[in-house]
């Protein structure tokens, strides 16, 4: 049995950033990271669109706003120091008709309150940034950028291991036992003990928390985001990042265009309920995941509230013409033949028992465990700052 001062469950970017922050602040503290897959960062981190978010959308004073603002600076600094490619390409949020002006104004006001560098621009200025866009007004956010978050995560893992700490892959946690002087984590790679445990289990964070004896009110419901990529001959239609004005009643940003750090342009995502927590395709069905979500009172209440929006998202999932139509609101020149299917991602969204989508980061503490129960976008951008916040919670326990 292997021992550590702190064990982290989950080898995605939040877990790895947390481990790295522990090694920076408490170099004498031994760290163990347990990852159920055979490689790091294969799920939410590995399917991330790679945007360095500015924090313009989030409620002032929220954990998302605070951590994103500080996190983007930390992420850019880390990538620069580690010579990981990133690009401050900028972003435009586009209103295509006057009915969207009110929501656009609200986003701009939030951006200013959060300290985001942003500018309201007219149609002529919009065309300077994105000549093919259809908007009549927009917000330009120059500090938004792009990066490969899996590359960042892998580098964090390398730095942790260089300091002599263990990253154990193939170690799905199947049991958690508390005892007087710590916690035993039973995994498919053997048993491990730790004085403190941090749960960064992503799509399975609520189940891990319950294994550890916690009773979170929320439950993870997986939403698949499906993408297309522009063929090379159409990539000139998008110079940076192009976003619509999002529906303020729905917690997703709408289909948009993202220029990628390694080349190419992604289009999407939609947001559809996935029938498995790792349901990257329509045919991925896990009966436990499906029944657990479908019988959860919070899910049923959410479905009643958002059924119309949900049907629209589902229609875009099954109908490429409907997906193309949504993209054409931003760039009318887009045609179906410009698009090829790209890998999907799955977002772990915490859902409350009242049907509310938890719209902020959610971190819960118990006796010897810290559970990250909700870490949606912009968690990757914010990961180094989230890790710092977790270490702040951990510090009194290990000093």
Q: Model-predicted segments: where are they?
A:
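C-terminal catalytic lobe of FAD-dependent flavoproteins
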Residues: 282, 294-297, 302-399
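Flavin-dependent oxidoreductases
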Residues: 17, 176-286
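Dinucleotide-binding Rossmann-like beta1-alpha1 core, especially the glycine-rich loop
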Residues: 50-125, 135, 254-255, 276, ...
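Glycine-rich FAD pyrophosphate-binding loop
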Residues: 23-46
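Helical element adjacent to the flavin cofactor pocket in flavoenzyme catalytic cores
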Residues: 139-196, 200, 204-207, 382-395
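Short beta-strand to alpha-helix junction loop
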Residues: 59-70, 94-104, 139-159, 168, ...
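Beta1/beta-strand and adjacent pyrophosphate-binding region of the FAD-binding site
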Residues: 1-14, 32
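Helix-loop-beta segment of a Rossmann-like dinucleotide-binding subdomain
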Residues: 85-95, 107, 120, 127-164, ...
